[in-house]
């Protein structure tokens, strides 16, 4: 049977097999057969820890006691002498029936431990105390192992065993670890005083040093481990938190999340050192499983640093390789695998697995666990479940324990039942000598006196005398001389107050006070109820009267308890009667109305009228009397017989002011007679005005200036309308007589004079206010807004590796500016073609100015002219080149010129390039934002305004120098330095030698950039000092020749980049959770200005007011709408009628749509889309951003296009600019989108649903619910500057009832979108016609 059981694959639990060992001890051969190497390892790990013998037996409940003893004694690594003593202690206190021979003078120690029972120490606590006494007397270990006792009680017990206990191994380790920290040693070694600790250190100094040297020899990697763990040590609070977490069933990754400032190696080592559990290999396995699952390399040094376990690590690696071969491996996350591995140690019940892994199959869970644990030991939760369900049917147990077989559960149940029986039988009888009757009586009398003095509640009596009948104790207390039946003890008062606060009724309180009479308890309840709070609200006056009477009666007699029972009994009866009266009076009763006859009603009216007339008569008499007295008084005042009365307040004010003016210089001190007035110089206090530095504002762009102008015009018009409404006179039938104001207004109308001067002033005041800037249209980084990344990777994938790297790009040169056959320059053709070629010199901006030279004028006179004065050709000294941060070998060329109209502005483009690269790489720092805006953008614009070409070139050189200093692409920087090429030599040659300024490190503020980018500030001495520096001795003679100007040593030295700069730079990029909306929109506008703006005339050649008329949705429109829809990186986007692809590019770049597409039929617009797509991908590559996933259908109509239909049905958000769609084209859109998923959003410029719309059952419009919105800002579309409305349509599950007629409602009830009705319903095309639009939509379309 035994061998057959071992071969059963389901019974993988070795503890089920160990149930065989509960048989008699004569079967030692069978026991040896069942004893496995895993059990041997587990037992060895247990006995090497400070554990009691009873805890070892509980861990192996199915194995006999003799077997475990023999295994412990046969182990070579354990301290056999200590284990003999622990076994003796266990059998003496927990198995007193067995007699053991004396081991190492144990009888004397046991007699001392026996005395602890008198101090209410249990047998298990005594055994644990003895274990700590032998192996670990540190504070942390005692607190964990004996939680029911204080440290003072434990120290007293230890001193009772021996006044000078020997030093345990753990105490010596603590002493070695904290040799110089006496405060910590005194706290951690609570049994020892400070003198004994110091003596131990002095006496055993040599041995301690030897132990330290031995430990260093054994662990030569200690210095390496310190280098690995560069973080600070755990604080005391963090260490306590870590100890608490170790006892919880959590995995290693969850524990690491609680301590983010420390490395995993350091936390792992601390766990192994602090782990006081019986099996300390559990956390070691969790740590190595974490390393294997998350592909963290572990070498021999790390294993030694953590604490060993090479064999465990190799086993975990082999198990993980097997798990990877499972079919369902890809459906699980790494965190789920790690959590399941953790659950295998703590809880493998079905309820826990289904709760924590709801989406996983139980069979898959079993497969994963069985690979890592071929023999799964019973977890603590499984054991507790079996202990609680010993009598539960076997089928229920098998269902709730999926990893256990029927035989394994049966054996475990038998072992648990046998263990409970043996523990009940093995209760240790008291070995103390029996007490005399006199001693018992004296002890009981002391306890009883303490009860009578402090607490006579039922709970206190039962706790003090648990084994004696409660009736006898109550009789003895009542017969005691010191017992007072008419006074509550402190414990009884506190209990009564608690019962009253909880709201317990008085009848429920009698049982808590067994020594008190019922009447006395009632009085005390009333007293506590009164003390707790007086009643303030009453339903009726009678209830209030009864309550106050009871309260008065209670106060009158509460001190008369000792006068006799007759009076108190009468008072209590009165209180009860008043309580009943109060309860009856609290009920509101409505008064019965008395019905009166007509005669009685007439008499009542006469009486009320009579009383009213009498009151009026008396009031009139009083008024007449007051008039007469007032007239007489006024006559006397006029005759001078009575002085007018003065109020007391007026007199006080006069006296106070007189005293003030008599004071000395206003010090409120009255001048005495004969005192001279002091002459004190007057002090004048002027308020201090601190001028706040004005924030630097960048030059307003033409678009922003146009928006501000339009907003002001709209405000003026609104104010004029309000003014006109106020001046319009109301219509009246009679002829109105003209007033002076009316005549003045008529004159102003005739002579056309301005009648609203205040309106202009109001407008001027409003002009001075700051203009509102929309968050969806930021003009610069100062007023920028952020877009959430929502978990997407903004940069290329190589930036997110453990060792980030910058990929190489294929840069090509362009020797001459040439035109290709299709009127496109070679440079533009290279940059817009869909391949990997990128120009070293991106000269598209230069070509725009060169090809439209008539639209530009020269900058101020200090700047080079656009044309060479001699050759009248383009001036090469006017070309400025700007480098890129990630690829310094790539730069962009600009021809310096001022646009006459709305053309590309080179100066603004350079500033824009500065701000884009700040937003992408340094946006985490406001300090760097200030440097970029003030030192670069603002000074660039200021140099043009102030006609200073020298300052302009200084800013350009400073930027290029900064890129060379900060670029993480070290290979490119070295190549550039090797070539020694000056890309801006020609424009710099235009300046005089005195105007040329070379930027220094202080100009670049390079230290500030390092400090802001790096997580830890670089030391000012991170660079080595030049070796050629020499220091003269003090005694050396001073030469009398010419004194040379000393070099700036700091600028010569600080040329080296800090070591952690590049890793910290890429770490900043990885931790980005938001991206600049300004940067995203400007990247799109840069591409648009180089491709579409130069070739936009053909877009206006289409017929006006048709579906092919071209109109654009500007970036602010797309940003606001898509943010309102919350477009996520996991969603798809499509634009029906995408034009040149602007919205498609923006959805992919700004919001990270995983797929962004569009359909366009116009030839020229499709061609421009292809050029824009090629250029934007190359711009993103140079900036280090991810490529866009685009899906265009160009040169095609969406009508009847299955490819476009498939793309639309798969997307989550659609934009349709149907501003000029006719009814037939709208109908085609509905049929094309028929079948969209519920929840899909459609954005349109006009409503697809007309008034009184009826469902046709062949279009998506049947399922739309429409919401109307309006743009928050002006100039969001290309054809009007006003705020435009737009519509968001949501695809519903079913057809709304308002779209159906009564008959159709009956027929289609219960039908949803998935089952469209197919009936003989005519397709009413008129229902799909575009409805009448709002007034705001009726504007003339501007081409």
Curated annotation (Swiss-Prot):
Residues 1-10, 420-430 have a biased composition (Polar residues). Residues 11-21, 226-236 have a biased composition (Basic and acidic residues). SUPFAM superfamilies: S-adenosyl-L-methionine-dependent methyltransferases (SSF53335). It comes from the Eukaryota. S-adenosyl-L-methionine binds at residues 1110-1113, 1133-1142, 1160, 1197-1198. It is found in: Nucleus. Keywords: Chromatin regulator, Methyltransferase, Nucleus, Repeat, S-adenosyl-L-methionine, Transcription, Transcription regulation, Transferase. The keyword Signal does not apply. It is an enzyme of class 2 (transferase). Residues 1-29, 210-236, 418-439 are annotated as: Disordered. Ubiquitination of histone H2B to form H2BK123ub1 is required for efficient DOT1 methyltransferase activity on histone H3. PROSITE patterns: DOT1. It catalyses: L-lysyl(79)-[histone H3] + 3 S-adenosyl-L-methionine = N(6),N(6),N(6)-trimethyl-L-lysyl(79)-[histone H3] + 3 S-adenosyl-L-homocysteine + 3 H(+). Its EC number is 2.1.1.360. Its main location: nucleus. Residues 987-1304 form the DOT1 domain. GO terms for cellular component: chromosome, telomeric region; nucleus. GO terms for biological process: DNA damage checkpoint signaling; DNA repair; methylation; subtelomeric heterochromatin formation. GO terms for molecular function: histone H3K79 methyltransferase activity; histone H3K79 trimethyltransferase activity. Histone methyltransferase that specifically trimethylates histone H3 to form H3K79me3. This methylation is required for telomere silencing and for the pachytene checkpoint during the meiotic cell cycle by allowing the recruitment of RAD9 to double strand breaks. Nucleosomes are preferred as substrate compared to free histone. In contrast to other lysine histone methyltransferases, it does not contain a SET domain, suggesting the existence of another mechanism for methylation of lysine residues of histones. Belongs to the class I-like SAM-binding methyltransferase superfamily. DOT1 family. This is Histone-lysine N-methyltransferase, H3 lysine-79 specific. The gene is DOT1.
